[in-house]
């Protein structure tokens, strides 16, 4: 895939902060998977949880979805910047107006420090590869 991607003149990636991604993914999947009732258990059994395709689609790492090297992309956007940065770029590129994104709304989700630490551990590959807001600007 790396070779095919390199052949493209414009290569766009949209990533999500790893902690936000896994926590949001858990709560989204929880709506459709009645057995998911504990974030702690989910984080402790993360590799086994990914065997469920529905959960894998929503909770896998940015690295798994986008590859290990953000610098292969010509344009990298944080999901939070879709409307303010990516949309204007695509409108300029295509010459047409594009509808803004409509993200699902939910109440504030609070997690414990231990859960955040475990989520960071589970998503460590994204921090190593730079798929996080702390490192992305230095990788591209």
What residue ranges belong to the model's regions?
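Long, positively charged, glycine-interspersed low-complexity recognition regions
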Residues: 120-140
